[in-house]
Amino acid sequence: PVQAGQEPGNVERSVRRQLETLHEAGKSSEQNVEFIWRHLGHDDRSIRYAARVALEFQEPALWQKRVLSESYPELLITAAVAMARPGDAVMQKNIVDRLLKIQFSGLSEFQKLEWLRALSLVFIRMEAPTVLQQRAVAQILEPEFPSNREMLDRELAGMLVYVNSTKVIDKTLKLMTETPDAGGEAEIPEVLARNAVYGGSIANMLANMPNLNQTPYAYVLRNMKYGWTLEQRRLY
């Protein structure tokens, strides 16, 4: 029999609960920051989340400079989210510089999504990107798009539009034309055949439906105000 202290996940739950005790004001200390920092890059997402929230309750003076010297990607990305939430514009350039030094191509798909989220939060909460920052982000992400990963491609398209990439329109339109429609078509005729009254009308409606997998890209491109050609507009 498994002892109570040996249950799977028991250690992780204990760590998470310790971190959650720091989710309130008035508990700032160097000792707490050290404990939190050890878990910001944890493999368990719930522990990373608990550590990040705990860090946000610590006095910024105890940890913000430490973020700028951090080299471990997962830890840096998580800490950057915590840093972005208060919205201190003074630190925007420093944290953007640190995020852009991470080798994006070497990250896992999940880490890339977290990186994009962190950078988005920095731009939204702290300060919008400068022209130079826009160009730097585009230079990193353009070779990565498309990635043939649906969720990642949607986020990449959104960021590239946000930074006014000169290549995102062509790449996204091409991706839209090549993206297959959502699945489920194989079962539809059989289902419609069961009802002679409504089947025909529904079949006509489905035949004229837009490609649902194209919709997120069309939605993102609506924000692209510059760089369109007449042919691109027509295709869009």
Where are these regions (language model features)?
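Extracellular/periplasmic ectodomains of large secreted or surface enzymes and adhesion receptors
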Residues: 1-236
